[in-house]
Amino acid sequence: MKAFAQRLENLHATRPVTVLGAAVIDVIADAYALPWRGCDIELKQQGVNIGGCALNIAIALKRLGITAQNALPVGHGVWADIIRNAMAKQDLHSAVEADTGDNGWCLALVEPDGERTFMSFSGVENQWQQRWLDALHVPQN
């Protein structure tokens, strides 16, 4: 394990890194059963987490001390504000800001046996625009 930790300490990027992808909100709730048509069930909230594969990678790179250009669309709205504030607390910023629309979120229902069911609401992270990509600073090979 020591050898692995030492390798991580010496890790560095040989080329500029760009992280391209989504930042979303995960609302996680315990459910005694999945809802069926016409029912009304009580949920117990476990937590609200900021997620998305690209955001998780951006956080990991930051912790490793690797500078990255983060292209994670952040919009305007309740969810976007939560994402923007969470990123700022970790000194992360996105090079992509959507003019309109909020970020997406996911409701994860967790049954007593641990099985998870997801209901996702797409936001600006799924509305990519060519001008966002054109504005990124990605050097040629």
Regions found by a protein language model. Give the residues of each.
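Glycine-rich phosphate/adenosyl-contacting loop at the front of the ribokinase-like
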Residues: M1-A71, D81
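Conserved N-terminal subdomain of the carbohydrate kinase-like
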Residues: C39-I41, R63-N141
